[in-house]
Design a protein with these regions (language model features):
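Basic/polar phosphate-binding segments, predominantly the helix-turn-helix DNA-binding elements
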Residues: 198, 203-242, 250, 259-287
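N-terminal low-complexity or simple alpha-helical regulatory segments
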Residues: 1-30
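Conserved ASCE/P-loop NTPase catalytic core
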Residues: 256
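Short, Lys/Arg-enriched, Trp-marked, Pro/Gly-tolerant hinge/linker segments that flank
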Residues: 123-140, 147-214, 227-239
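N-terminal regulatory/effector-sensing and dimerization cores
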Residues: 21-124, 154
Length: 287
């Protein structure tokens, strides 16, 4: 094999690896929003997970299987997906097909304030979206346009980027016009259980601790919690640890320290779990 052929092959492999690696964008000046994209996600594999943010993404190439709570749909290029905070979901490519997407995660408090300013809520509480997927071309184009503006390193000012974010999410609100989800867990016991887990996610929690906080028996808690949140209390705990880890990594904390602080056995344990739920390594996310 000639040196030219070897060099060409190496460059091709580098491009392939680059296309399959997730890219993240975030800015200290705009802490309420984070963007993620991948050009070739055919090897991506997401386990069921949730976010503490409102998340919206666009499939730009290929097809995937989209799970959101109890719904399962096959979606393709042009689809826009929406995930309310804490809604369990997953989106994975059809086997062997090149798959690309862009995703935005936005702070709930920021979006709630925008909803209030637009007249969609009166009590300053986030209004969840009942719709989980849309084929609206305006939303699709707007999301891609916002991602391009955010990722433009030549534009160092925040005014254009923040204005573009407000414009897009105002359009999301006007287009989807969310309705309040049916009231669940009127007694608040499950909410107390979830809150207790979230506040103590870095500790070595026992099931008895969660039961005591919620005032529920273990059998009822496990059954009702999974029905309400789409995952067991343990899975919810792991998700919260990953959310905590993401926040620490964004601040530049060393991965080994994050692993121990978040309650994982070691860095390898964090690495495996992070990859399974985020479809990226802690190092890729931290960059």
């Amino acid at each position: 094999m000639s040196e030219t052929t070897e060099a060409t092959g190496a460059a091709s492999n580098a491009r392939a690896k680059g296309a399959s690696a997730p890219r993240f964008w975030r800015s200290d000046a705009l802490p309420f929003i984070e963007a993620r994209s991948i050009d070739d996600g055919r090897k991506v594999c997401y386990a069921k997970h949730s976010h503490e943010t409102f998340s919206i993404g666009a499939v730009t190439n290929g097809r995937s299987v989209y799970l959101n709570r109890h719904a399962r749909e096959w979606i393709g290029s042009g689809a826009v997906v929406m995930m309310n905070p804490d809604d369990v979901h997953a989106c994975n490519p059809v086997a062997g097909e090149r798959w690309s997407y862009r995703m935005l995660h936005v702070d709930v408090a920021w979006f709630t304030k925008l909803q209030h300013e637009l007249g969609f809520n009166e009590n300053h509480a986030f209004r969840a979206f009942s719709q989980i997927m849309s084929l609206d071309a305006g939303l699709f184009d707007g999301l891609n346009r916002l991602c391009a503006i955010l990722a433009n390193d030549d534009d160092t000012g925040t005014l254009r980027k923040e204005s573009a974010a407000i414009t897009f999410f105002s359009n999301v609100q006007q287009t989807l016009n969310p309705t309040t989800l049916p009231e669940r867990d009127a007694s608040g016991q499950l909410a107390r259980a979830a809150e207790f887990i979230a506040e103590n996610c870095t500790r070595a929690l026992k099931l008895d601790d969660v039961c005591a906080a919620a005032g529920l028996s273990a059998s009822h808690l496990i059954r009702a919690f999974k029905q309400r949140y789409g995952m067991t209390p343990h899975a919810y705990l792991i998700n919260r640890r990953i959310q905590y880890s993401r926040a620490q990594l964004r601040r530049g904390a060393p991965i080994a320290d994050v692993a121990l602080d978040a309650g994982f056995a070691d860095q390898a344990h964090l690495q495996r779990t992070f990859k399974r739920l985020v479809a990226a390594t802690p190092g890729q996310y931290r960059c």
